[in-house]
Amino acid sequence: MSKAKFERSKPHVNIGTIGHVDHGKTTLTAAITTVLAQAGGAEAFKYDEIDKAPEEKERGITINTAHVEYETANRHYAHVDCPGHADYVKNMITGAAQMDGAILVCSAADGPMPQTREHILLSSRVGVDHIVVFLNKADMVDDEELLELVEMEVRELLSEYNFPGDDIPVIKGSALVALENPTDEAATACIRELMDAVDSYIPTPERATDKPFLMPVEDVFTITGRGTVATGRVERGVLHVGDEVEVIGLTEERRKTVVTGIEMFRKLLDEAQAGDNIGALLRGIQRTDIERGQVLAQVGTINPHKKFVGQVYVLKKEEGGRHTPFFDGYRPQFYFRTTDVTGSIKLPEGMEMVMPGDHIDMEVELITEIAMDEGLRFAIREGGRTVGSGVVTSIIE
């Protein structure tokens, strides 16, 4: 059978399976591809193909993730599944594989377990706002009341972390039975029901081009007789010649300027959009007024901050991280977008130290402002090597 070409006209959504080890995340991923393959919407993957996920490096951190893609009648999905718990923690904090929503897999026979809780907590921290629940192994539970009890427990757990526990779709079924009987209507009904829920409950994400313009400044130079040019890759939004933008970060001052020219690959453009590497010619800006580490942004859409709370994963020794713990008041460099800024760390109350391999919430105070909003990723570096990776979960000031 020849491979069907994926239709790219459908909206694209990134999702992933989360949940406790051995509750059936990988089996479910295999079942989804196998059932959808019947309708020509996927290439069927076997359990082993997903389980032996290749290692990837994201900011120097090794993460095992399996990527599969499939489509429903309404959407095209990229789906990520991580074999190990540590891989989930690292993936979610570094944002290696972006997730717009998640399928929480929980074994109906065991109920919520420690990693069920941990993955829900992580999702709430890193901005995975929409979760659909699949109560797996439901065929192993004979007692209907017990099933209802587990569903209630999962809903309460979700509510505890500010998810709308009462409204979240919960689908019961068996991923294994569906995987082994992909042509059996009854066995695969739970998979179709799950994908219908994912289709309707997880919203289509806002495209990067629809967001307010932002470009991290990578380099600055002067064109004699024309003015100052800032170069970088547009992170989000669209920029037109004649737009007013602000230069933000590394100082309290916000400097406004008008973009009088946009250049890409030595050609002049009228507009640039997310993903483009450009040079922007800025009116009335001196070479000394702007530097790497600042951002150009649509006026009034982002602010410079010094103090924030971050969820951080601390690299293990084997990953090239520190060999020893660090303590309250530790002062490493925080790498945001294109620059390092020194900052000091305040550990949560009652925590003496942080060991390599831990993931924690920490309060950080930088020595200078950086343009930031919630969800911004950063690396923690010490003498040029990465010792941690984090995401801004809330801004203090």
From Swiss-Prot:
Chain intervals for the UniProt region annotation (G4): 136-139
Q: Where does Mg(2+) bind?
A: T26
- GO cellular component terms listed in the entry, alphabetical order: cytosol
A Pfam family it matches: GTP_EFTU_D2
Q: Does the keyword Transmembrane apply?
A: no
Catalytic reaction annotation: GTP + H2O = GDP + phosphate + H(+)
Q: Which residues cross the membrane?
A: none
Q: Where is the tr-type G domain?
A: 10-206
Q: Where in the cell is it found?
A: Cytoplasm
What Gene3D superfamilies does its record include?
Answer: P-loop containing nucleotide triphosphate hydrolases (3.40.50.300), Translation factors (2.40.30.10)
User: Which residues of the sequence carry a binding annotation for GTP?
Assistant: 19-26, 81-85, 136-139
Any one GO MF annotation of this record: GTPase activity
Q: Any idea which UniProt keywords this protein has?
A: Cytoplasm, Elongation factor, GTP-binding, Hydrolase, Magnesium, Metal-binding, Nucleotide-binding, Protein biosynthesis
- Tell me its EC number(s), please: 3.6.5.3
Region annotated G3, chain positions: 81-84
InterPro entries of this UniProt entry?
Answer: EF-Tu_GTP-bd, EF-Tu_GTPase, EFTu-like_2, EFTU_2, G_TR_CS, P-loop_NTPase, Small_GTP-bd, T_Tr_GTP-bd_dom
Question: Where does the record place the region G1?
Answer: 19-26
**Residue segments, region G2:** 60-64
G5: where is this region?
A: 174-176
Q: What does this protein do?
A: GTP hydrolase that promotes the GTP-dependent binding of aminoacyl-tRNA to the A-site of ribosomes during protein biosynthesis.
HAMAP family membership: EF_Tu_B
Family under the similarity heading: Belongs to the TRAFAC class translation factor GTPase superfamily. Classic translation factor GTPase family. EF-Tu/EF-1A subfamily.
Q: How does it assemble?
A: Monomer.
Q: What is this protein called?
A: Elongation factor Tu
Q: Which organism is it from?
A: Clostridium perfringens (strain 13 / Type A)
The uppermost taxa in this organism's lineage are:
Bacteria, Bacillati, Bacillota, Clostridia, Eubacteriales
| Protein's gene | tufA
